[in-house]
UniProtKB/Swiss-Prot annotation:
GO terms for cellular component: plasma membrane. Its EC number is 7.2.2.11. Gene3D superfamilies: P-loop containing nucleotide triphosphate hydrolases. Part of the ABC transporter complex NikABCDE involved in nickel import. Responsible for energy coupling to the transport system. It comes from Escherichia coli O157:H7. It is a peripheral membrane protein. Keywords: ATP-binding, Cell inner membrane, Cell membrane, Ion transport, Membrane, Nickel, Nickel transport, Nucleotide-binding, Translocase, Transport. This is Nickel import ATP-binding protein NikE. Pfam families: ABC_tran. Its main location: membrane.
Amino acid sequence: MTLLNVSDLSHHYAHGGFSGKHQHQAVLNNVSLTLKSGETVALLGRSGCGKSTLSRLLVGLESPSQGNISWRGESLAKLNRAQRKAFRRDIQMVFQDSISAVNPRKTVREILREPMRHLLSLKKSEQLARASEMLHAVDLDDSVLDKRPPQLSGGQLQRVCLARALAVEPKLLILDEAVSNLDLVLQAGVIRLLKKLQQQFGTACLFITHDLRLVERFCQRVMVMDNGQIVETQAVGEKLTFSSDAGRVLQNAILPAFPVRRRATEKV
């Protein structure tokens, strides 16, 4: 089943010029893509290529300058109030900047309950039980429930944001560089959790990243973005190779997992 369909999406931002006239800076240009239930897809590209702008459009935080975004066959622009509430539950996003994504005055307990209060019909006791369950799923314990964001490490807060997104059992989870910053052990644990959710609920995942290793470990398909356009789409197999210049640049930039020892005869 197709969850998300994007057709000919373009977006620009207006900036004031010295002459007083607005100048338009194009960020996305004719982007089209689809995501299906249970699918794991990566959007790969260097910083500034338009990935994060696209993610904001996909979750409805901004409206595109041109083109259409459909969720389960319905255009986002035409959703009624009840449909929009269901959409906000079905599609959740975890941002790279976790500090800006939470209220620093709220406790972790309040942060986790927030989407459940607004999007689910659960009693308070059920919300608290699920909050604890989601914390354990991301390798945190109940001792953080009464803490506030400034009292947590960056990795802990990122996992709190992930737990908050998972609490409403979304159909699509968008992770904007949200896993790349975790250490390898935590990253592996999060990936195991996401795979479990896919098996149980058919949750689709869109990884917005520059981390090719993450793509190779977890994703089924990868789209390469460059200068606001998707320039290549590849299935992820044992040997992932790119045909686009942007894809090859990203692949060549990856360091080996372990340092390569020089032979004794090699000159330094």
